[in-house]
């Protein structure tokens, strides 16, 4: 039998950092942990783009702000994002207009243009060095290189995006052989890790405080408790900016599952970084609308080459290991089929995206009646655009300012779901039902631990218990409860990222059970001796 590792203390390393072009894996602790009780006007949980955008606005307005980050700045999904800042919409403006009318589509366009402008303003005012540059965006279709986007163009014009136009792209290798596309001028790309580092510095300069390695265990509208036992008072508001909002206990989790988490489905987006000759690919953002959709743009690779970032192959999070296939290989084949000058693959990673049924984010007052608690989630993969918009809406709400976009992004709004359960996302229901069935159904055939490859994991049945087993590179096995600490869904091994994912609400844990992101705030329970 494979060697069973003795019980170990949790490591002091940072779980969940990835090797991407932004060097997220090199992020170091720059701010102290909170080691005492504290009091603030506003407490922000999470140092991603939503949390830091809100914190900066609040600190500049004179509020005493404390940001509590469970790992380090940029360790979350913003630090994994592809780096594009866009007013493009994953629903498309044509669908938005047909579903909600031109007025709402116009508000969506205005909100995203405003978010892009706000990012630019922050970078300029705070002098953030984050490789920011403005580029054009193009909607294309790989299935029809000469596609006509007349209906979408008209909808974008109706939404106020008058500079968008159908253009000739010439069909050369610089544009991936595409002959025609829909131009969206004045988009931007940046390094999200450097941007968040700059935002955190700006928060401190404005009088706020940032605390790293300070995980919140539970919270209410005016009090929070950390995993270290520190109590933090929030005199005016709590902002929960943790991607998928964390919850405090079983009852809180169950209520939020209906009121918030169930309104969206948690998905995984894969990305790769490919080496290409300097200047051989047009410096733009390409949004390929064919199925499955892809996004392509460049990052700086230094003097010798560029890095082509290709994102896509979205899938529901928490699938069984055998259902993943080869998403990174599919992304590379997609790129090579269009840009034959592609050289080797430099990076591969993924990140979590949350998708409400309307594909519009949820930013503002927590729909669960906690006066003074605000949440930001549901960016649909528009991580920087949606996160900036969400942080701004939340800051305005805390300050009592009117925001023209608050209603269309309200977490408490009624979504257009199924007729008999209009607030719940049907894929959320399906994924949850599947997980519950897998949880209560005995697993008749277990993976043979001896055959489990090093640095791999699987879920097995031991008596009445489901066990998450990880075999490390040295062949030692580690066992944990495969039950998600949030609401008890069955975790699955993610072979692409080598972590444990929850298919229901989005909690993620590293290979040795350490919490990466919520809604769970707990690590997996070790099960020493269960494999003996």
Feature map (PLM): residue ranges:
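C-terminal catalytic lobe of FAD-dependent flavoproteins
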Residues: 186, 291, 316-423, 480
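Flavin-dependent oxidoreductases
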Residues: 218-299, 450
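Rieske [2Fe-2S] iron-sulfur-binding domain
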Residues: 458-532
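Glycine-rich FAD pyrophosphate-binding loop
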Residues: 60-80
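N-terminal Rossmann-like FAD-binding beta1-loop-alpha1 element of flavoenzymes
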Residues: 40-67
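Extreme N-terminal leader/targeting segments of oxidoreductases
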Residues: 1-42, 60, 524-528
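Flavin (FAD/FMN) cofactor-binding and adjacent substrate-gating region
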Residues: 6-23, 91-97, 121-201
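Helical element adjacent to the flavin cofactor pocket in flavoenzyme catalytic cores
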Residues: 155, 181-236, 241
């Amino acid at each position: 039998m494979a060697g069973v590792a003795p019980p170990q203390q949790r490591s002091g390393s940072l779980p969940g950092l990835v090797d991407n072009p932004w060097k997220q894996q090199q992020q170091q602790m720059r701010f102290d942990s909170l080691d005492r009780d504290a009091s603030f006007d506003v407490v922000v949980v999470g140092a991603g783009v939503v949390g830091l955008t809100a914190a900066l606005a609040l600190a500049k307005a004179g509020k005493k702000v404390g940001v509590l980050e469970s790992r380090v700045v940029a360790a979350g999904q913003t630090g994994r994002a592809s780096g594009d800042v866009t007013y493009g919409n994953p629903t498309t403006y044509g669908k938005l207009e047909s579903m909600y009318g031109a007025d709402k589509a116009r508000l969506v366009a205005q909100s995203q243009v405003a978010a892009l402008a706000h990012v630019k303003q922050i970078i300029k005012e705070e002098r953030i060095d984050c490789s920011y540059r403005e580029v054009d965006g193009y909607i294309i279709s790989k299935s029809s290189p000469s596609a006509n986007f007349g209906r979408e163009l008209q909808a974008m014009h109706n939404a106020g995006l008058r500079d968008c136009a159908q253009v000739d792209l010439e069909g050369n290798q610089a544009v991936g052989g595409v002959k025609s596309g829909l131009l969206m001028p004045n988009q931007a790309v940046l390094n999200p890790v450097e941007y968040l580092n700059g935002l955190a510095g700006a928060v401190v300069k404005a009088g706020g405080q940032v605390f790293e390695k300070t995980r919140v265990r539970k919270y209410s509208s005016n009090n929070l408790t950390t995993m270290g036992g520190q109590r933090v008072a929030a005199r005016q508001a709590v902002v929960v900016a943790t991607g998928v909002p964390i919850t405090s206990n079983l009852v809180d989790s169950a209520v939020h599952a209906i009121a918030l988490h169930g309104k969206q489905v948690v998905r995984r987006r894969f990305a790769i970084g490919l080496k290409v000759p300097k200047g051989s690919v047009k410096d733009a953002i390409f949004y390929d609308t064919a199925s499955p959709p892809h996004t392509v743009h460049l990052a700086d690779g230094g003097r010798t080459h560029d890095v082509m970032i290709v994102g896509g192959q979205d899938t529901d999070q928490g699938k069984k290991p055998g259902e993943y296939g080869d998403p990174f290989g599919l992304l590379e084949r997609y790129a090579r089929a269009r840009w034959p000058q592609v050289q080797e693959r430099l990076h591969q990673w993924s990140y979590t995206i949350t998708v409400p049924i309307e594909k519009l984010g949820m930013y503002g007052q927590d729909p669960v009646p906690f006066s003074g608690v605000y949440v930001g989630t549901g960016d649909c993969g528009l991580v920087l655009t949606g996160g900036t918009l969400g942080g701004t809406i939340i800051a305005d709400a805390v300050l009592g300012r009117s925001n023209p976009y608050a209603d269309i992004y309200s977490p408490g709004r009624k979504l257009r779901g199924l007729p008999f359960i209009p607030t719940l996302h049907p894929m959320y229901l399906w994924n949850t039902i599947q997980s519950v069935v897998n949880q209560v159904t005995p697993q008749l055939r277990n993976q043979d631990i001896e055959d489990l490859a090093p640095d791999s994991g699987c879920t097995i049945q031991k008596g009445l218990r489901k066990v998450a087993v990880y075999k490390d590179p040295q062949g030692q096995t580690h066992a944990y409860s495969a039950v998600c600490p949030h609401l008890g869904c069955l975790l699955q091994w993610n072979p692409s990222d080598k972590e444990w994912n929850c298919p229901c609400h989005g909690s993620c844990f590293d290979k040795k059970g350490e919490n990466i992101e919520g809604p769970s705030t707990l690590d997996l329970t070790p099960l020493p001796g269960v494999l003996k």
